[in-house]
Amino acid sequence: NQSNGQNLTNTFLSQGADVILPVAGPVGLGTGAALEANGSGTMIWVDSDGYLTTDYGSLIITSVMKEIGAAVFDSIQEQVNGSFSNEPYVGTLENGGVGLAEFHDFEGQVPQDVVDRVAELQEQIISGELVIESPNAP
């Protein structure tokens, strides 16, 4: 909840954190409120482009996005084509199911070597050169 997000963020800030990645829906709103109240720190949003969907855009470096629209589109297209299956859908960089939002207000503040490295890692993941595995994958 928002209160937990605010409390946890205040704890992280007191421990020297300067970037917070809240992962749990409304917790991010509490994080934004805490960052705003403290006048320091930034955050990385989750699920959607928080810059566009919250009041804390000026605090959001980027967002780790679930591109649910891609999954919905693919499912509808499979149904129309008669190829729909009940196999679990896993959103990946390759199938457009996940991604990073733009840096928006932080565009000029993120060092170019970091931007380049992130792009390089994304390309390596998509090509299969860098394999990311999870024991929780379906």
Map each language-model feature to its residues.
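A residue-level marker of the well-folded mature domains of exported/periplasmic proteins
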Residues: 1-138
